[in-house]
Amino acid sequence: MKERIVNLETLDFEISQEVSLRPSLWEDFIGQEKIKSNLQISICAAKKRQESLDHMLFFGPPGLGKTSISHIIAKEMETNIKITAAPMIEKSGDLAAILTNLQAKDILFIDEIHRLSPAIEEVLYPAMEDFRLDIIIGSGPAAQTIKIDLPPFTLIGATTRAGMLSNPLRDRFGMSFRMQFYNPSELALIIKKAAVKLNQDIKQESADEIAKRSRGTPRIALRLLKRVRDFALVKNSSLMDLNITLHALNELGVNELGFDEADLAYLSLLANAQGKPVGLNTIAASMREDEGTIEDVIEPFLLANGYLERTAKGRIATPKTHELLKIPTLNPQTLF
C-alpha cells in the first residue's frame, strides 16, 4: 500500500518538526481534559509529598498525544524523561542499563510497551514494585542473583494495543488512561496554534476544514496543515484560505470525512460482503497489508464513528457504511 497522508505513525522527516510543535505546558495541550485534570492532581500531590509519581499507562490509537503529555508531566515534576521503545529493549541487560542510569523521580517512557518480551517483563516487575533490579549472573546451580537498589522512578507505558499487555504488567500501573479522539473544535484550535508557530496565516474556515478531515487525530491535523501550507506557497499566497485548503485536501485524496483510498477500500470490502462477517486475515490479504496495521491504523477511527462492527467471526459493515458507499443492503431472501 502506498504511503497514506492520514498515516497515524510519525514519518521519519516529521520527527524534528513534531518536536518543534509539541506543547510544553498544560495550557498549550488542547483536549483530553479529564486526563489532564487527574494528572494535575496527581502531580501536585506527588510534589507535596516529595515523591515520584505512580507508574502510569496511556493507551489508544497513535497520534493522540501520549508522548507529548509525558513530556509535560516531566516538566511539571521538574525531572528528566528518558524515551525508549519496547522493540529496542531486546535483552535484560538493555533494560538494566536504562534503569541504573535513572535519577530519583526520573520518568522512563516506554512506547509500544505491549511488545516487551516476557523475560524483560520479569526484570521490570521488581523494578516497578520495589525499585530493585534482580540480575542473575551465571547459569545452572552456580547462578547467583545480585540485587541492585534503584532510585524511585516513574514508568510511563504507551500502547496502541492495551489488550496485548500481560495481566501482571497491567496490574502494576497505578494509573491508566485511555486517550480519546479529539473533536473538530479542539483540532481547529491545535491547527491555529501550530500555524502561529509556523508563521503561517490561516483563515478560521480553513482550520475548521482541516480539522474536519483529520480523523480526530492531532498528528494528522498537523500533517495536513503543513501540506496545505505547501500548496499555498506554490500558489504564491501568504494566506491559507478556504479555496486553497479545499483544493489541497482534494488533491491529497482526503475526503470530507477524513477517509482516503485505504479506508474506502476497506469499507467497500465489508459492504460488498452483504452482512457476512469478513475475517481479519481475509481483509489483510485483500488489501495487501499486515493485520496489525488494519487493527491499529485503519479500524479505530472507523469503529469509533460507527462504520463497522467487530464480531467473533469477523468484521461487518454497518448501515452507515452502506449509505456512505451507496451499496444497498440486500434482503436476506434475495441471497438465495
Swiss-Prot record:
A molecular-function term among this protein's GO annotations: four-way junction helicase activity
UniProt GO cellular component terms:
cytoplasm; Holliday junction resolvase complex
- Annotated spans, Head domain (RuvB-H): 256-336
Binding residues for Mg(2+), per the UniProt record? 67
- The signal peptide here is none
| Binding-site residues for ATP, renumbered to this chain | 21-22, 63, 66-68, 129-131, 172, 182, 219
Q: What is this enzyme's EC?
A: 3.6.4.-
Tell me the segments the record calls region Large ATPase domain (RuvB-L): 1-182
Q: Which keywords are on file for this protein?
A: ATP-binding, Cytoplasm, DNA damage, DNA recombination, DNA repair, DNA-binding, Hydrolase, Nucleotide-binding
User: InterPro entries from the xrefs?
Assistant: AAA+_ATPase (IPR003593), AAA_lid_4 (IPR041445), DNA_helicase_Holl-junc_RuvB (IPR004605), P-loop_NTPase (IPR027417), RuvB-like_N (IPR008824), RuvB_C (IPR008823), WH-like_DNA-bd_sf (IPR036388), WH_DNA-bd_sf (IPR036390)
Task: Provide the reaction this enzyme catalyses.
Answer: ATP + H2O = ADP + phosphate + H(+)
Q: Where does DNA bind?
A: 310, 315
State its location(s): Cytoplasm
Q: Where is this region: Small ATPAse domain (RuvB-S)?
A: 183-253
Report the record's Gene Ontology biological process terms: DNA recombination; DNA repair
The entry sums up its family as follows:
Belongs to the RuvB family.
Q: What does this protein do?
A: The RuvA-RuvB-RuvC complex processes Holliday junction (HJ) DNA during genetic recombination and DNA repair, while the RuvA-RuvB complex plays an important role in the rescue of blocked DNA replication forks via replication fork reversal (RFR). RuvA specifically binds to HJ cruciform DNA, conferring on it an open structure. The RuvB hexamer acts as an ATP-dependent pump, pulling dsDNA into and through the RuvAB complex. RuvB forms 2 homohexamers on either side of HJ DNA bound by 1 or 2 RuvA tetramers; 4 subunits per hexamer contact DNA at a time.
How does the entry describe the domains? Has 3 domains, the large (RuvB-L) and small ATPase (RuvB-S) domains and the C-terminal head (RuvB-H) domain. The head domain binds DNA, while the ATPase domains jointly bind ATP, ADP or are empty depending on the state of the subunit in the translocation cycle. During a single DNA translocation step the structure of each domain remains the same, but their relative positions change.
Subunit and interaction comment? Homohexamer. Forms an RuvA(8)-RuvB(12)-Holliday junction (HJ) complex. HJ DNA is sandwiched between 2 RuvA tetramers; dsDNA enters through RuvA and exits via RuvB. An RuvB hexamer assembles on each DNA strand where it exits the tetramer. Each RuvB hexamer is contacted by two RuvA subunits (via domain III) on 2 adjacent RuvB subunits; this complex drives branch migration. In the full resolvosome a probable DNA-RuvA(4)-RuvB(12)-RuvC(2) complex forms which resolves the HJ.
The protein here is known as Holliday junction branch migration complex subunit RuvB
Originating gene = ruvB
